[in-house]
Amino acid sequence: MASAGSGMEEVRVSVLTPLKLVGLVCIFLALCLDLGAVLSPAWVTADHQYYLSLWESCRKPASLDIWHCESTLSSDWQIATLALLLGGAAIILIAFLVGLISICVGSRRRFYRPVAVMLFAAVVLQVCSLVLYPIKFIETVSLKIYHEFNWGYGLAWGATIFSFGGAILYCLNPKNYEDYY
Protein backbone atom coordinates (compact mmCIF):
# COMPACT_ATOMS: atom_id res chain seq x y z
CA MET A 1 0.00 0.00 0.00
CA ALA A 2 1.27 3.47 -0.80
CA SER A 3 2.09 5.87 2.00
CA ALA A 4 -0.65 8.18 3.27
CA GLY A 5 1.38 11.25 2.34
CA SER A 6 1.44 10.53 -1.38
CA GLY A 7 -2.35 10.52 -1.78
CA MET A 8 -2.23 7.26 -3.71
CA GLU A 9 -4.33 4.28 -2.75
CA GLU A 10 -3.87 0.73 -3.81
CA VAL A 11 -6.86 -0.65 -5.60
CA ARG A 12 -7.22 -4.39 -5.98
CA VAL A 13 -8.73 -5.49 -9.22
CA SER A 14 -9.94 -9.02 -9.77
CA VAL A 15 -9.72 -9.95 -13.41
CA LEU A 16 -12.49 -12.08 -14.82
CA THR A 17 -10.80 -14.67 -16.98
CA PRO A 18 -12.32 -16.06 -20.17
CA LEU A 19 -12.13 -19.54 -18.63
CA LYS A 20 -14.63 -18.58 -15.96
CA LEU A 21 -16.94 -16.89 -18.46
CA VAL A 22 -16.92 -19.99 -20.64
CA GLY A 23 -17.46 -22.07 -17.49
CA LEU A 24 -20.50 -19.97 -16.61
CA VAL A 25 -21.85 -20.41 -20.15
CA CYS A 26 -21.34 -24.18 -19.79
CA ILE A 27 -23.31 -24.13 -16.54
CA PHE A 28 -26.12 -22.15 -18.17
CA LEU A 29 -26.25 -24.60 -21.10
CA ALA A 30 -26.33 -27.50 -18.64
CA LEU A 31 -29.31 -25.89 -16.91
CA CYS A 32 -31.15 -25.46 -20.21
CA LEU A 33 -30.42 -29.04 -21.27
CA ASP A 34 -31.52 -30.37 -17.87
CA LEU A 35 -34.79 -28.48 -18.17
CA GLY A 36 -35.34 -29.92 -21.64
CA ALA A 37 -34.50 -33.43 -20.44
CA VAL A 38 -36.83 -33.30 -17.46
CA LEU A 39 -39.72 -31.96 -19.54
CA SER A 40 -39.05 -34.23 -22.53
CA PRO A 41 -41.79 -36.69 -23.44
CA ALA A 42 -39.31 -38.96 -25.21
CA TRP A 43 -36.71 -40.80 -23.17
CA VAL A 44 -37.52 -44.15 -24.74
CA THR A 45 -39.59 -44.65 -27.89
CA ALA A 46 -40.61 -47.75 -29.80
CA ASP A 47 -42.07 -47.68 -33.32
CA HIS A 48 -44.90 -45.23 -32.57
CA GLN A 49 -46.37 -47.77 -30.14
CA TYR A 50 -44.64 -46.91 -26.89
CA TYR A 51 -42.94 -43.97 -25.26
CA LEU A 52 -41.54 -43.43 -21.82
CA SER A 53 -40.63 -40.16 -20.16
CA LEU A 54 -39.67 -39.36 -16.59
CA TRP A 55 -43.33 -38.65 -15.83
CA GLU A 56 -45.45 -41.09 -17.82
CA SER A 57 -45.42 -44.27 -19.83
CA CYS A 58 -47.73 -44.57 -22.84
CA ARG A 59 -48.66 -47.57 -24.98
CA LYS A 60 -50.73 -47.77 -28.12
CA PRO A 61 -51.82 -51.22 -29.24
CA ALA A 62 -51.20 -51.71 -32.95
CA SER A 63 -54.89 -52.27 -33.65
CA LEU A 64 -56.11 -49.10 -31.87
CA ASP A 65 -55.53 -45.39 -32.33
CA ILE A 66 -55.88 -44.60 -28.62
CA TRP A 67 -52.89 -44.16 -26.32
CA HIS A 68 -53.07 -45.64 -22.81
CA CYS A 69 -50.88 -43.63 -20.43
CA GLU A 70 -49.96 -44.15 -16.80
CA SER A 71 -47.74 -42.37 -14.33
CA THR A 72 -44.19 -43.63 -13.91
CA LEU A 73 -44.01 -42.31 -10.37
CA SER A 74 -45.22 -45.66 -9.02
CA SER A 75 -41.94 -47.36 -9.86
CA ASP A 76 -39.05 -47.01 -7.41
CA TRP A 77 -36.30 -46.89 -10.03
CA GLN A 78 -38.07 -44.19 -12.02
CA ILE A 79 -38.58 -42.10 -8.88
CA ALA A 80 -34.89 -42.58 -8.03
CA THR A 81 -33.88 -41.55 -11.55
CA LEU A 82 -36.04 -38.45 -11.38
CA ALA A 83 -34.81 -37.55 -7.88
CA LEU A 84 -31.14 -37.93 -8.86
CA LEU A 85 -31.62 -35.91 -12.03
CA LEU A 86 -33.56 -33.14 -10.28
CA GLY A 87 -31.06 -33.12 -7.42
CA GLY A 88 -28.24 -32.65 -9.90
CA ALA A 89 -30.17 -29.91 -11.68
CA ALA A 90 -30.81 -28.12 -8.38
CA ILE A 91 -27.10 -28.21 -7.56
CA ILE A 92 -26.29 -26.90 -11.04
CA LEU A 93 -28.77 -24.05 -10.51
CA ILE A 94 -27.11 -23.15 -7.20
CA ALA A 95 -23.66 -23.32 -8.82
CA PHE A 96 -24.88 -21.07 -11.64
CA LEU A 97 -26.25 -18.52 -9.18
CA VAL A 98 -23.03 -18.55 -7.14
CA GLY A 99 -20.99 -18.19 -10.34
CA LEU A 100 -23.18 -15.33 -11.50
CA ILE A 101 -22.96 -13.59 -8.13
CA SER A 102 -19.19 -14.06 -8.12
CA ILE A 103 -18.98 -11.99 -11.30
CA CYS A 104 -20.68 -9.10 -9.52
CA VAL A 105 -18.54 -9.37 -6.36
CA GLY A 106 -14.94 -8.16 -6.28
CA SER A 107 -13.39 -11.29 -4.75
CA ARG A 108 -14.20 -13.91 -7.34
CA ARG A 109 -11.48 -16.43 -6.60
CA ARG A 110 -13.00 -17.61 -3.35
CA PHE A 111 -16.13 -18.73 -5.24
CA TYR A 112 -14.29 -20.84 -7.83
CA ARG A 113 -13.70 -23.90 -5.68
CA PRO A 114 -17.26 -24.14 -4.26
CA VAL A 115 -18.72 -23.83 -7.77
CA ALA A 116 -16.41 -26.59 -9.05
CA VAL A 117 -17.24 -28.87 -6.11
CA MET A 118 -20.98 -28.33 -6.60
CA LEU A 119 -20.68 -29.09 -10.31
CA PHE A 120 -18.70 -32.29 -9.69
CA ALA A 121 -21.36 -33.37 -7.15
CA ALA A 122 -24.08 -32.67 -9.74
CA VAL A 123 -22.19 -34.70 -12.34
CA VAL A 124 -21.99 -37.66 -9.96
CA LEU A 125 -25.74 -37.51 -9.26
CA GLN A 126 -26.64 -37.19 -12.91
CA VAL A 127 -24.31 -39.95 -14.08
CA CYS A 128 -25.86 -42.23 -11.45
CA SER A 129 -29.34 -41.42 -12.76
CA LEU A 130 -28.31 -41.87 -16.39
CA VAL A 131 -26.69 -45.24 -15.72
CA LEU A 132 -29.56 -46.43 -13.53
CA TYR A 133 -32.23 -45.54 -16.09
CA PRO A 134 -31.28 -47.88 -18.98
CA ILE A 135 -30.26 -50.72 -16.69
CA LYS A 136 -33.56 -50.76 -14.84
CA PHE A 137 -35.56 -50.06 -18.01
CA ILE A 138 -34.11 -53.09 -19.79
CA GLU A 139 -34.53 -55.18 -16.64
CA THR A 140 -38.17 -54.29 -15.95
CA VAL A 141 -39.83 -53.33 -19.24
CA SER A 142 -40.12 -56.09 -21.80
CA LEU A 143 -40.89 -54.77 -25.24
CA LYS A 144 -41.28 -57.13 -28.16
CA ILE A 145 -40.53 -54.33 -30.62
CA TYR A 146 -37.42 -52.30 -31.39
CA HIS A 147 -36.93 -49.45 -28.94
CA GLU A 148 -34.35 -46.71 -28.61
CA PHE A 149 -33.28 -44.16 -26.06
CA ASN A 150 -34.37 -40.88 -27.51
CA TRP A 151 -33.53 -37.19 -27.39
CA GLY A 152 -34.67 -36.59 -23.79
CA TYR A 153 -32.09 -39.07 -22.56
CA GLY A 154 -29.50 -37.46 -24.84
CA LEU A 155 -30.27 -34.00 -23.46
CA ALA A 156 -29.63 -35.30 -19.96
CA TRP A 157 -26.23 -36.62 -21.06
CA GLY A 158 -25.51 -33.28 -22.71
CA ALA A 159 -26.31 -31.46 -19.47
CA THR A 160 -23.99 -33.78 -17.57
CA ILE A 161 -21.16 -33.22 -20.05
CA PHE A 162 -21.55 -29.43 -19.94
CA SER A 163 -21.60 -29.55 -16.12
CA PHE A 164 -18.38 -31.54 -16.15
CA GLY A 165 -16.81 -29.06 -18.57
CA GLY A 166 -17.87 -26.15 -16.36
CA ALA A 167 -16.41 -27.88 -13.31
CA ILE A 168 -13.08 -28.39 -15.09
CA LEU A 169 -13.00 -24.74 -16.18
CA TYR A 170 -13.69 -23.57 -12.63
CA CYS A 171 -10.84 -25.79 -11.38
CA LEU A 172 -8.24 -24.20 -13.65
CA ASN A 173 -6.08 -21.69 -11.82
CA PRO A 174 -5.79 -18.47 -13.82
CA LYS A 175 -2.52 -17.58 -12.06
CA ASN A 176 -0.83 -20.33 -14.03
CA TYR A 177 -2.13 -19.01 -17.34
CA GLU A 178 -1.45 -15.28 -17.05
CA ASP A 179 0.73 -15.32 -20.17
CA TYR A 180 -2.29 -16.23 -22.28
CA TYR A 181 -4.42 -13.26 -21.26
Curated annotation (Swiss-Prot):
Biological processes annotated in GO: cell-cell adhesion
UniProt modified residues of type N-acetylalanine: A2
Residue stretches spanning the membrane: 21-41, 83-103, 115-135, 152-172
Subcellular location: Membrane; Cell junction, Adherens junction
Predominant subcellular localization, coarse grouping: membrane
CC per GO annotation: adherens junction; cell-cell junction; plasma membrane
A Pfam family of this chain: PMP22_Claudin
InterPro entries (alphabetical): P53_induced, PMP22/EMP/MP20/Claudin
Keyword entries, A-Z: Acetylation, Cell junction, Membrane, Transmembrane, Transmembrane helix
Membrane topology label: Multi-pass membrane protein
Tissue: Expressed in adult brain, fetal brain, cerebellum, heart, lung, prostate and thyroid.
Quaternary organization: Interacts with CTNNB1, CTNNA1, PRKCI, PARD6B, FYB1.
Function per UniProt: Regulates cell junction organization in epithelial cells. May play a role in the transition from adherens junction to tight junction assembly. May regulate F-actin polymerization required for tight junctional localization dynamics and affect the junctional localization of PARD6B. During podocyte differentiation may negatively regulate activity of FYN and subsequently the abundance of nephrin.
Family: Belongs to the TMEM47 family.
Protein name, UniProt field: Transmembrane protein 47
